[in-house]
Amino acid sequence: MVSWIRKNLLLVLTVSSVVLGALCGFLLRGLQLSPQNIMYISFPGELLMHMLKMMILPLIMSSLISGLAQLDARQSGKLGSLAVTYYMFTTAVAVVTGIFLVLVIHPGDPTIKKEIGTGTEGKTVSTVDTLLDLLRNMFPENVVQATFQQVQTKYIKVRPKVVKNNDSATLAALNNGSLDYVKASVEYTSGMNVLGVIVFCIAIGISLSQLGQEAHVMVQFFVIMDKVIMKLVMTVMWYSPFGILCLIMGKILEIHDLADTARMLAMYMVTVLSGLAIHSLISLPLIFFVTTKKNPYVFMRGLFQAWITGLGTASSSDTLPITYICLEENLGVDRRVTRFVLPVGATINMDGTALYEAVAAIFIAQINGVHLSFGQVVTVSLTATLASIGAASVPSAGLVTMLLVLTAVGLPVKDVSLIVAVDWLLDRIRTSINVLGDAMGAGIVYHYSKADLDAHDRLAATTRSHSIAMNDEKRQLAVYNSLPTDDEKHTH
């Protein structure tokens, strides 16, 4: 037992930090701490988030470029197609699971809205504009700018200009705002454009792969940079248990009227948590077993550290460094697979978010007494899938993209604010499911590409041996040619 604890000390500390953080948070709620004191308690957790975020950009760049540069174009294409197929399928399964549960359990009761009160006015969101933003962010006009800003369509209320010949009725309408209209404006907002950076790095990695030996020095630079970043990550990991403890404790202390909110939204929480449990403990393991014929729960055991970190940070991108270590060191997945599949998965594969958005949208319809037709349910499933892909892998992004799903079926956007009170908990749990889905996807992709990768390694080793042998022959020939002949000896 002692030897097991010593071997898995970091995992034990991380799990203990989650339990202690929750326990201390609930115990300290009775002290009615001020927002300033709560901020002080959360500060070590804030530092952890800063450390992890600091690693994301260099890690994504070095891992993607070094991983793809060591593959040929055919292998890159195969890895990409396998990963995207897996992502689309598991997201669809998650959405269907969520919709089935919310329709069967029916957690939404119109009396809930009366108890909680009406929501605050929300923002307008267009499905088309969201799609266009996704495409704009995929191809940033400035790569440096993409490291700290992304494109987002915002809606501005515009008032028509008053002209001299306006009649009194028109002037009155202009003054009271009834002639105002909403105009879409494409703006830059703060936050790294992860999707754009990934697309750029994929292009660079594939180009380096095609250049072959010419690009050897540049490839080695990114390989070494990747190792340096992972060394820094290992140092941060030993600080993470304390940071996670403070994050969870601070978040529990921030929540007002925790008991009342939990009572009123209990069935909604049960529905979401049941869906996430079914997806993570049944659907994903079943997909893994059918595709690899291996025990999925043994594989999942090796991912426990990443799962717990996702629970603490509520961000799949921030958990990325730990997921790399779990897959490569605990489970022996080839780094060329993890370095390509995981950054893409952390950006577009959001199974937990898709399930949550489908459940939340239908729950809001139920508390408003709105019966959704089959066509509207299909619309919810499609837009939830799209919204989960468009959601940045940052805390509470799912709450923002919920607006897209509600707008698509004509539900009141302002009612999103009714479920904000419990989102801090659901966000952490669905993020941990997102991390699990990404990692299991990497395991499945590795299973199908292992033979090709091994063949590529054997070919590379043979080519290297042949090259060394040729160089030795040339060296021996040069030495032989430099020796004097018998005639030259006689002359001397």
UniProtKB/Swiss-Prot annotation:
Any GO CC annotation of this UniProt entry: plasma membrane
Keywords: Glycoprotein, Membrane, Symport, Transmembrane, Transmembrane helix, Transport
Glycosylation sites noted in the Swiss-Prot or TrEMBL record: 166, 176
Transmembrane residue ranges: 8-28, 47-67, 85-105, 192-212, 228-248, 270-290, 358-378, 389-409
InterPro entries registered for this protein in UniProt: DAACS, Na-dicarboxylate_symporter, Na-dicarboxylate_symporter_CS, Na:dicarbo_symporter_sf
Family classification: Belongs to the dicarboxylate/amino acid:cation symporter (DAACS) (TC 2.A.23) family.
Protein name, UniProt field: Excitatory amino acid transporter
Source organism per UniProt: Onchocerca volvulus
